[in-house]
């Protein structure tokens, strides 16, 4: 199956609550590669690459996030594969 990448912008109370760590763990569990990083405006940017089905599973998970977070919105953008990510990094 073709590998795709998606970029997600997660808004809400998502910084300082372990969101990136849990996202990285979930991404690896789903067999995805990519990263999660904090943005200056308080959002978290997630780029994930893998099969469309696994990306959809991550998208659904991001809408809830870990129990410590309060997700208000998840915006999903398609992303050109700019980098062949190894693992799922926390930036």
Curated annotation (Swiss-Prot):
Active-site residues annotated for this sequence: 20, 38
Keyword Hydrolase attached: yes
GO function terms (MF aspect): acylphosphatase activity
EC number: 3.6.1.7
Record keyword Hydrolase present: yes
Domain annotation Acylphosphatase-like: ranges: 5-91
Pfam families: Acylphosphatase (PF00708)
Alphabetized InterPro entries for the sequence: Acylphosphatase, Acylphosphatase-like_dom, Acylphosphatase-like_dom_sf, Acylphosphatase_CS
UniProt keywords, alphabetically: Hydrolase
Family designation: Belongs to the acylphosphatase family.
Protein name: Acylphosphatase
Organism: Vibrio cholerae serotype O1 (strain ATCC 39315 / El Tor Inaba N16961)
């Amino acid at each position: 199956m073709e590998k795709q990448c998606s970029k997600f912008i997660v808004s809400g109370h998502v910084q300082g609550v372990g969101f990136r760590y849990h996202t990285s763990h979930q991404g690896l569990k789903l067999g995805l590669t990519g990263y999660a990083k904090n943005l200056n405006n308080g959002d978290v940017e997630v780029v994930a690459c893998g099969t469309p089905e696994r990306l959809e599973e991550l998208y659904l998970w991001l809408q809830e996030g870990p129990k410590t977070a309060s997700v208000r919105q998840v915006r999903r953008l398609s992303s050109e594969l700019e980098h062949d990510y190894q693992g799922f990094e926390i930036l």
